[in-house]
Amino acid sequence: MVPQSDDFERIVLKNIPLIDVRAPVEFAQGAFEMAHNLPLMNDEERQTVGICYKQKGHDEAVKLGHRLVNDKVRLPRVSGWQSFMEKYPEAMLYCFRGGMRSKIAQQWLADNGCEIVRLKGGYKAFRRYLIDHLEIMPQRFSTEGIQTWALGGRTGCGKTRLLHTLDNAIDLEGLANHRGSAFGGHVAPQPTQINFENTLAMAVMRFYAQGHSSLVLEDESHCIGSVSVPKTFFDFFKGGRQVLLEAPLEERVSITREEYVEQAQAEYETTEDWTVFMRSAFGRIRKRLGGERYQRVLKKFDQACENQHRTQEFDAHDDWIRILLTEYYDPMYDYQMQKKQCKIDFSGNFDAVKDFLSQQS
């Protein structure tokens, strides 16, 4: 009997590698962080079989599929699965519903002396499992008295850095691959909404399994770049207690320069590519900056880029960063804080907030 498993919790907690035998176009729409796309059929083959299925039915589509994936095509694909299994002996495989494609892949591997477990219900069942857990976890946290802390603070105060020092934190911006502002994009694209939800659900499950008594998240908006936090989970952590990270202006300027200039430039092939991205980001907030301030910031930015090119130093970028922080981001932050009027349970500098949140874990 061919082995199957729907022990999705074990897959998540053990981070078991998965072979996704769906076509690349399906994989791109949504998958799992531990999955590797080694398809049974490529996009063109899948489309051809799909058309045949609609026109001639199931049996003819199956026959066509076997003709398309003949020995010449089959052998390198089986070899790819075998190589993956040699590297990850505990690997499992799946297709969309745990049906014919994963059964065929499983049988072909068995014919070559390799036994592999396939996911019962496939991608669809695993995805449903994760979404259900993301829905029920807030209630479970409440029932078990697990406290959520929303970490707030002005732009550049080091919230993400602080999160990375805590064992009981989840970095939503990290999962979304976006720093949550007009300048927050990375060279690598953001995950799809589906992938973000899948990864968030796994992060929450792993957090819960560690037995912490509190969860710390950055005080985010509903949308982080192009992805959004699922409503049930968002409402839950927004209802948590508030802690505020404070930092003097010059420290915030320095942190912002390191993250948005120095580290950001390292992601791009050339400094010019980064400059193009930054000019586009300035353009996205031009209306909110106002014409005069926009021109002033852009002039400081151009001067900083020229100075960096000449001296290989980054310090001149502090001038435009300081303007953005004090004249753009800080007023927006003050407005939002006044609008929310939420109780701040604790506030302090980096070390004080870190110590406080560590004690809550």
Swiss-Prot record:
One of its GO terms (biological process) is tRNA wobble uridine modification. Its EC number is 2.9.1.3. GO terms for molecular function: transferase activity, transferring alkyl or aryl (other than methyl) groups; tRNA 2-selenouridine synthase activity. Transmembrane segments: none annotated. Coiled coil: none annotated. Residues 12-135 form the Rhodanese domain. Pfam families: Rhodanese. Keywords: Selenium, Transferase. It catalyses: 5-methylaminomethyl-2-thiouridine(34) in tRNA + selenophosphate + (2E)-geranyl diphosphate + H2O + H(+) = 5-methylaminomethyl-2-selenouridine(34) in tRNA + (2E)-thiogeraniol + phosphate + diphosphate; 5-methylaminomethyl-2-thiouridine(34) in tRNA + (2E)-geranyl diphosphate = 5-methylaminomethyl-S-(2E)-geranyl-thiouridine(34) in tRNA + diphosphate; 5-methylaminomethyl-S-(2E)-geranyl-thiouridine(34) in tRNA + selenophosphate + H(+) = 5-methylaminomethyl-2-(Se-phospho)selenouridine(34) in tRNA + (2E)-thiogeraniol; 5-methylaminomethyl-2-(Se-phospho)selenouridine(34) in tRNA + H2O = 5-methylaminomethyl-2-selenouridine(34) in tRNA + phosphate. InterPro entries: Rhodanese-like_dom, Rhodanese-like_dom_sf, SelU. The active site is at C95 (s-selanylcysteine intermediate). Involved in the post-transcriptional modification of the uridine at the wobble position (U34) of tRNA(Lys), tRNA(Glu) and tRNA(Gln). Catalyzes the conversion of 2-thiouridine (S2U-RNA) to 2-selenouridine (Se2U-RNA). Acts in a two-step process involving geranylation of 2-thiouridine (S2U) to S-geranyl-2-thiouridine (geS2U) and subsequent selenation of the latter derivative to 2-selenouridine (Se2U) in the tRNA chain. Monomer. NCBIfam families: PRK11784.1-2, PRK11784.1-3, tRNA_sel_U_synt. PANTHER family: TRNA 2-SELENOURIDINE SYNTHASE. Belongs to the SelU family. This is tRNA 2-selenouridine synthase. It comes from Hydrogenovibrio crunogenus (strain DSM 25203 / XCL-2) (Thiomicrospira crunogena). The gene is selU.
